Amino acid sequence: MIEGLQEMLKRDFNITFKDVDLLDAAFTHASYVNETPERKKKLKYYERIEFLGDAVMQLCVSEYIYEHYPEMPEGKMSRLRAAMVRADSFSKFAIECHFNEYIRLGKGEEKGNARQRPSLLCDIFESFIGALYLDQGKDEVVRFISKVIFPKLELGWFDHMMDNKTELQEVLQQNGECKIKYNEVNVTGPDNERVYTMNVVVNNEVMGEGTGRTKKAAEQMAAYQALKKLRK
């Protein structure tokens, strides 16, 4: 199983671990160790590495938000980071990376379909990040999540957790009823790489404009720009 994991990481992410035992531990569940008594003293499992991976993800995501959203208020930065490092987000990333296929489980956990359990998938994703950090450092972690996670911001992947449109509506309605409308301003790029520009109009006044890979993502950015304008 570890050989298949190494091949996948090299093929899909150009990652080659120097310490293969560390990678092995990152994908080993305690149930597997407990059911292998003759190797119990030698085998390690992921929980301590996961602890480190959680902290590394918090740092890397915080740095990315700080650098790429220089005018975002601290409160919104915290909400965005929370959305990006949620357990359900990590479990989806793990499946997207096919990590669930390489977890070493005990027979009982395997029968219980633990391989698809969101909490375990979240743990494995964090454990992989911790192992990658120990093996190759923070820069390699950033390179990996720049491929797996950060592009999802442009695609509006976290919109349901960071709803600028709803926040804008709530802020505006504090001062009474108002008419909010989102309009398509421009569309560029080929069919498979569309970039949309949308604006938000409040009582016939353009309050913000944003771009994104989907109309919904562009609308969220337009709402964010409108919120910035209102806070000035």
Swiss-Prot record:
UniProt-recorded Gene Ontology molecular function terms: double-stranded RNA binding; metal ion binding; ribonuclease III activity; rRNA binding
GO CC annotation, single: cytoplasm
Subcellular location: Cytoplasm
Keywords: Cytoplasm, Endonuclease, Hydrolase, Magnesium, Metal-binding, mRNA processing, Nuclease, RNA-binding, rRNA processing, rRNA-binding, tRNA processing
Biological-process GO terms, alphabetical: mRNA processing; regulation of gene expression; rRNA processing; tRNA processing
DRBM domain residues: 163-232
Domain RNase III: 6-137
Enzyme active site: D54, E126
Quaternary state and interactors: Homodimer.
Protein name as it appears in the record: Ribonuclease 3
